[in-house]
Amino acid sequence: MTIRSLPAALSPLSMAVQAVLLVSSLALAPAANAKPVTWEDIANDHLNTQNVLQYGMGTNAQRWSPLAMVNDKNVFKLTPAWSYSFGDERQRGQESQAIINDGVIYVTGSYSRVFALDAKTGRRLWTYNHRLPDNIRPCCDVVNRGAAIFGDKIYFGTLDARVIALNKDTGKVVWNKKFGDHSAGYTMTGAPTLIKDQKSGKVLLIHGSSGDEFGVVGQLYARDPETGEEVWMRPFVEGHMGRLNGKDSTPTGDVKAPSWPDDPTTETGKVESWSHGGGAPWQSASFDPETNTIIVGAGNPGPWNTWARTSKDGNPHDFDSLYTSGQVGVDPTTGEVKWFYQHTPNDAWDFSGNNELVLFDYKDKDGKQYKATAHADRNGFFYVVDRTNGKLKNAFPFVDNITWASHIDLKTGRPVENEGQRPAKPLPGETKGKPVEVSPPFLGGKNWNPMAYSQDTGLFYVPANHWKEEYWTEEVNYKKGSAYLGIGFRIKRMYEDHVGSLRAMDPTTGKVVWEHNERLPLWAGVLATKGNLVFTGTGDGYFKAFNAKTGEELWKFQTGSGIVSPPITWEQDGEQYIGVTVGYGGAVPLWGGDMAELTKPVAQGGSFWVFKIPAWDTKTAKR
């Protein structure tokens, strides 16, 4: 089957479905009355074992817990404590990382829903169901990846391009801000991030936008968490104008945008693609208080077709399509770009740059230490970047058989591309270019699903995939609300025995320390703990625990539907709990070609599972 446009499942939602998407706040129990969250709580989230307040389990996004009550010696005793069903017919992909504060879990669901649950029992405290219009345009399923919390409010984004604040105890709407035209493709699927500007002392709510596949211009926002009012907005296409306090501020990069071709026949003086250039920061940001820097990934350029972003008869290597498919350091006071590192210049394959940016202390082969970001890109390369200035320190492949580039030049920071891997223009008189086989495909060596870093082993645990793809160019013109790709594609198998591969990577040597292969693609995030454990989920519904040092599979549990979310862990009343959202969906079954066929037998679902060692047997057991 040739895929040339967005899946039918992502057309405007039917009136029948929308009829049941009612705004509600069901007070099925007394108000949660959890403690208000302070900035100090958020700043110490990575150290606090009782709460999980940020996406990434801390502003450093390491997904590392110092808890060890559940460990490699007793993890085989894990049993379900409870499970909560999201209910009704609204299933699809459940990609949410839950957060927890003072014994209350807040987890988002598909179709822009939020649930507040008692962390001990799973009892529902309240539910918020957002009313969605018919003409939303999510590219990659009706997912939501999580909420944020500060003070007495819960914050999350919606598929109709809104960011909403709810009272954390009742689920009532406090404020609701529209930031983009959803009919043009603007959405919000990522979890917002709370940061504190070290210069002004103000706490800010940071969120991005989605919609690169529809020709939006990606934008990063800072808001007052109390009122929702915009403080600043920064676009991620070179030459587009930012805002500060409601007024135009500065353009992003050079106002003349030399990384995008000129076209004197247009109103802007630039090629059409510049006006619809993508770069959407749809994943959650990280924050480095030491350098007072927001660090976030920028999405793919629009359209995918590299020739639409290259001058007539020009060379794609002369036009990098800034500031797309890379990582950006942003000043929280003004929204200005402090630094930018591009993983894939003039990205021709939709590799994007949105995968998480993990903050860690990197020690190079000579023993010199740097404050760094770690990033496993969809293009198949793992990057270590100095987060004080955006300079590349190390890069190496984390998946097999990368075809589009031979390596990353550590001196220039640029990929060394292999000839013939950019899909060629159609020949004269033809509407489609000659197909070219590329690996990884646009779904990536790893996609949005976040890796974890262990402070004990010094390893990154990367949920990777091995697959490949045929690409070919097609004619492309912008039309509001329609897919803006200019590329056709089909994803294919690389190996017969597996697609997914959980890999433990050494960031200094680039070596694979261990790997565990899975038959289906890996689309779940990873959690690492001081108990020498690594947790993740599989496409066929298993929640698994591995020995962090050796990769030995120690425990698994069948949840009933595929897992495409990041797990969390916390301590309550002297016991360690592990929780994970369950429900198969996301991009793979919608865009995945042969992979969609492979995953057809997986049942949909929507639930949150919690595990612990039974109270009657909490002593460390000998195996």
Curated annotation (Swiss-Prot):
Regulation: Enhanced by the presence of ethylamine or NH4(+) ions.
Textual note on the cofactor: Binds 1 PQQ group non-covalently per subunit. PQQ is inserted between disulfide Cys-139-Cys-140 and the plane of Trp-282.
Phenotype reported upon loss of the gene: Cells lacking this gene show a strong reduction in the growth rate on ethanol, however growth on 1-butanol or 1,2-propanediol is not influenced.
SUPFAM superfamilies in the record: Quinoprotein alcohol dehydrogenase-like
Positions of pyrroloquinoline quinone binding: E95, R145, T189, H207, G208, S209, R378, W523, A587
Residue windows of the WD repeats: 515-556, 559-601
Top EC class, one word: oxidoreductase
Cofactor dependency: pyrroloquinoline quinone; Ca(2+)
Name this polypeptide is given: Quinoprotein ethanol dehydrogenase
Taxonomic lineage: Bacteria, Pseudomonadati, Pseudomonadota, Gammaproteobacteria, Pseudomonadales
Gene this protein is translated from: qedA
